[in-house]
Design a protein with these regions (language model features):
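Catalytic core of pol beta-like nucleotidyltransferases
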Residues: 1-25, 31-37, 48-100
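A short, structured beta-strand/loop element
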Residues: 37-43
Length: 100
């Protein structure tokens, strides 16, 4: 459980189901002691197979999740991450929602 931010699990699950998200995890400063009141929340998502999202829809999802969490959200998929640090982010991410 993340100590830096309170996550309404039922609302988060509803968000993920509506947007065909298979997994949602936190990464970055939200998992560390240097997380501040002004810090954004880095979120890693994976969509259901075959579900493709455009940039405008992704931006809308980012805004919606920002309202849910009460902070600016930076929403990313593994493909969005640099190959130089993708594995580290995926390995260290803290799962918040998993489909099923």
């Amino acid at each position: 459980m993340n100590k830096n931010i309170v996550v309404p699990k039922n609302i988060l699950a509803d968000f993920c189901k509506r947007h065909h998200i298979r997994t949602l995890a936190f990464f970055g400063s939200v998992l560390r002691d240097d997380f501040k009141p002004t810090s954004d929340v880095d979120v890693l998502i994976e969509f259901e197979p075959g579900h493709v999202i455009g940039l405008i829809r992704l931006a809308g999802m980012e805004l919606e999740l920002s309202k849910i969490l009460g902070r600016k959200v930076d929403l990313r998929t593994p493909a969005d991450l640099s190959r130089y640090f993708r594995e580290e982010v995926v390995r260290s991410a803290e799962l918040q929602y998993a489909q099923g």
